[in-house]
Amino acid sequence: MSFDTLELHPTLLRAVAALGFTAPTPVQGSAIPPARDGRDVLACAATGTGKTAAFMLPILHRLLAGRRRVTRALVLAPTRELAAQIDEHRRALGRYTDLGGTAIFGGVAMEPQQTALRRGVEILVATPGRLLDHLRHPYARLDGVEIVVLDEADRMLDMGFLPDVRRILGALGPARRQTMLFSATLPPAIVTLARDFLRDPVRIDVERAPAPAAGVRHTAYPVAREGKVPLLLDLLRRPEVHNVLAFTRTKHRADRLATALTRGGVAADRIHGNRSQAQRTKALAAFKAGRLRVLVATDIAARGIDVTGLSHVVNFDMPDAPESYIHRTGRTARAEAAGDAVTFVTPEEEMEFRSIERAVRRPIHRIERR
């Protein structure tokens, strides 16, 4: 199967090609056709299966026809990191369209988010708590929403957000809309939620991401957020660290890290959704040829990267889910070779790190810096 067979708008196929996507993943191949046609979807799919594009491509396809500058699609996500990543996918996949969007979440000022909501955006990605904060004010209107996505619904359940989700869905009014629910697992509370808000959904089950590659040595470095760049520069001074694929959570952090490394005398470049296809191709070619020692990447931009002899993967920023960790670190130790996966862990990321240890099925050795 190719993306061309999914009957998506030509501008979306152009973006898919520019991102280097060749064939849809199983969840994309199963979910995109019914979602494109307006059906409700209930998908059991974990992070790392390509689920974000599975709902974002149909959203963009459907919204290309119709009104602008009014919120027509709402994506709810459990964490601000995931919301930011979904919005990055939205930008990358919608790069050749005029559809606007934004992500709103806690931990940052509300004023820029208020401005975006007043101006009007077609696609709104939000965490439940911050969205409810905005819904207390008249500028936040969701009466035009036609499509709703609940992403990682089981994580929202674990974090206690389900009552907030129900309040938000109830505030959308009785108008018929398309609803898609994605969840790695389907506990009873999620099944009940689906029964209450989805109408005759297409049910999709996708196998979880594969187990960690056997040849990877996993280590972790506890570090303060401001100490990450000095730590990476220190690691790069070691002779066994030949080349590094470093992952950040956002494209802006990828830019900043590549700049900091270059200033530190390290040959580095970055790839992410805001870089042109020519820029990404040039950076990857230079990395494979050994002209770059570090390639900084976001998860979406790194899809499909295969570098022979990659010595180290560095999780400069913690992945958003254990499955993402497995996909990231599997890029080293290819073809039965050995490789190293190094994760920087800030005090705020301890809980996420423990989830990763469960995913790799063993404790990860921590190295304390002196």
Functional labels for PLM-detected ranges:
Residues 2-370:
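Conserved helicase RecA-like core
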